[in-house]
Structures are given as structure tokens and as C-alpha cells.
Amino acid sequence: NESHNRRYNVNVHYNQMDELVKLLQDSLPNVSILLTTPPGSYESFRQRRRRRTYAVNPRTATASETIRRYAKEHRLLVWDMYDVVGGKRRACVNWTEAKLMRPDHVHYLPEGYILQGNLLYQALINAYNDYVSH
């Protein structure tokens, strides 16, 4: 959600993640933490005669990079959904072409959220299978 703010600030986002992770680690020291990146979305603009137009939200890629960097610097796990679903070039296009986004171009239809959950599930199962086979 941070990337939907047009005043998105990398440092603020990084520090907010740090506060949350430290709070979780202090409260639940033996629990693993998995960070995820956002799936991609659009932002809307008003055109003449109150017509809306949509463009890929450029801050999503920045927020995803911030999450990946934070995870790397703090030795946390991260599942990069943004990359899995197409990254900067295709994430939004893929969701739109599959007709899995709501008309606001930010939120997803139930089928879109189900797909996101299934992708995460498959990633976890694949990682576990790799772990037990090595």
C-alpha cells in the first residue's frame, strides 16, 4: 500500500519495515519472517471531462526493490511476487489481460487474490521440496 502514496519515500518505507520487523522479532523471537513484494497496480489520473485514465504505478517497482534490499540487509526471506508475475514490464499488463483486476485498477477480483495465494503456496512447496531433497 505504501507505493500508492504519490509522496512515497524509500527511506520512510525502509524505516517503517525496520520498526515492524524489530517489533515482531522482539515479541516473537523464534518466528521466521517472510516478506513479500506487491503484485503491481495502476494509478489513475483525471483527464478532461472527468474521464479517468490509468498508468502503471511507477512506485511499485521502487517499493519492491526497497523490500528486497531490506530483506537482504537483514537476512530475511523474501518472496518477490512482483517479479514472479512479470516485474516492471509485465506485472500490470498480465493482471489486466487476464481480467483479474477490479475496475479501479488497484484491487483484484477474488480470482486474482486466489491466484496470488496459489503462487505463494507453490513457491513455499517448491522451496520445501528443494530443501528436503538436498
Task: Put a short name on every predicted segment.
Residues 11-18, 22, 118, 122-125:
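Amphipathic, non-transmembrane alpha-helical secondary structure
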Residues 28-33, 73-77:
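Loop/turn elements at helix/coil->beta-strand transitions in domains of secreted/extracellular proteins
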Residues 1-12:
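Oxyanion-hole/transition-state-stabilizing segment in secreted/luminal serine hydrolases
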